Design a protein with these regions (language model features):
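Conserved SAM/AdoMet-binding glycine-rich loop
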Residues: 53-54, 307-347
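Active-site loops and adjacent core secondary-structure elements that bind or stabilize anionic groups
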Residues: 12, 173, 263
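Canonical Radical SAM [4Fe-4S] cluster-binding loop centered on the CxxxCxxC motif
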Residues: 65, 267-303
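Short, small-residue-biased leader/transition segments that mark boundaries at the very start
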Residues: 1-13
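A short beta-strand-loop structural module common to alpha/beta enzyme folds
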Residues: 79-92
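N-terminal [4Fe-4S]-dependent radical SAM core
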Residues: 22-52, 59-60, 217, 223-274
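Glycine-rich beta-alpha loop elements in corrinoid/cobalamin-binding modules
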Residues: 89-235
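Helix-enriched interaction subdomains in cytosolic or periplasmic regions
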Residues: 14-28, 78
Length: 347
């Protein structure tokens, strides 16, 4: 309708990568059509960098992940970047896409992932490693980084599993070690400069390797002991650092946060407003990987969290709020925050 075109000038309502007969046959077709509330639409002709943000699991799991929402919002605040989402298709659509040779596509534009500049994959747990290969295979992107050309996107990995990236290093062009808010702007700016320069893919990776927190696997030689443990790990390129240091956001209060998170069409595992009240944990439990990775403890300002709650409820229509952290009971302003939220929103 005319009204729909006005509200969503570049919406996917009039275009789908999947035919109607496919959507009618598969389970939960809303996983694949895009167009949700707060999904960001842009004109491809007005941007310089296309970034596909991937959670390598089904839509219901990926849409519940706060980290994806944070980076999606942060990237799309830039006028020169369009960040879109992609998730692992369920078995039924996977089968159809292979049979009909339909390349995996982004939700917002419905364009093939292989046509993007970057494919960013968050790696939250080892059980999703096979899904990463599924994503690359369905996208028609060469599985191994060494086989990719200038026609392929750069594949970058992030998330907690990148602290031990070697098991999957051959499939990635680069990894980001640490919290994503710190260095992506520099990476995107470097890509824009490289894109029109006529330089090789390797030359861009050499530039990326100079950015703090970025690990480019092809620039390192790994040697292993007979039992499979790492024996040595040395750079083979002058631009690669001997040690890649994790990057952390010290001031989480002023870090980017999504005031308009995407609201899914279907029920997902965490279907509510999420307030990240702190990062890190004071407990130091030896069995907890996250408690070690996300040190030190950094708290968000309680007054800022109160405002976030107002804005996010208004922008989403959600009726529930969850307080997210590794140990929310250790948040120093917990009593004040919870009391305020109960009193303010009880009706």
């Amino acid at each position: 309708s005319t009204q729909a075109k006005t509200l969503f000038p570049y919406t996917t309502l009039f275009r789908s990568a999947l035919d109607d007969d496919i959507l009618l046959e598969i389970e939960k077709p809303a996983r694949y059509i895009g167009g949700e509330v707060n999904a960001v639409m842009k004109n491809v002709e007005d941007i310089d960098v296309r970034f596909a943000m991937c959670f390598p699991d089904v839509y219901e799991i990926g849409m519940s992940h706060l980290g994806i929402q944070i980076l999606y919002d942060m990237f799309n605040r830039r006028e020169d970047v369009w960040c879109e989402r992609v998730y692992s298709p369920w078995h039924d659509l996977d089968k159809v896409m292979r049979e009909q040779k339909i390349p995996l596509f982004a939700l917002e534009s419905q364009d093939p992932i292989k046509d993007f500049d970057f494919l960013g994959i968050t790696i939250q747990f080892e059980m999703c490693y096979t899904n990463i290969l599924q994503i690359l295979d369905l996208s028609q992107i060469p599985l191994h980084a060494k086989d990719r050309t200038l026609d392929d996107p750069f594949v970058i990995g992030g998330g907690p599993c990148t602290y031990n990236p070697e098991p999957i290093a051959e499939f990635f062009d680069l990894f980001y070690i640490g919290e994503g808010e710190t260095a992506y702007d520099e990476l995107l700016d470097a890509y824009k400069e490289w894109k029109g320069s006529g330089k090789s893919r390797r030359e861009f990776l050499e530039r990326a390797a100079q950015i703090e927190g970025l690990y480019v696997p092809i620039f390192y030689d790994a040697e292993y002991n007979e039992d499979g443990t790492l024996k040595s790990f040395t750079p083979n390129n002058e631009y690669a650092s001997a040690v890649v240091k994790k990057q952390i956001v010290m001031d989480v209060t002023d870090a980017p946060y999504p005031m308009k998170p995407v609201v899914p069409f279907i029920k997902v595992t965490q279907d509510r407003v999420v307030l990240e009240i702190q990062r890190g944990c004071i407990r130091g439990c030896r069995f907890c990987q996250a408690g070690m990775l996300y040190r030190p403890v950094r708290e968000r300002n309680v007054e800022r969290l109160k405002q976030y709650a107002h804005d996010m409820l208004q922008n989403t229509g959600h009726e529930e709020i969850s307080l997210s952290s590794l140990s929310s009971s250790d948040y120093s302003e917990l009593k004040e925050l919870v009391t305020y939220l109960i009193d303010e929103f009880k009706n």
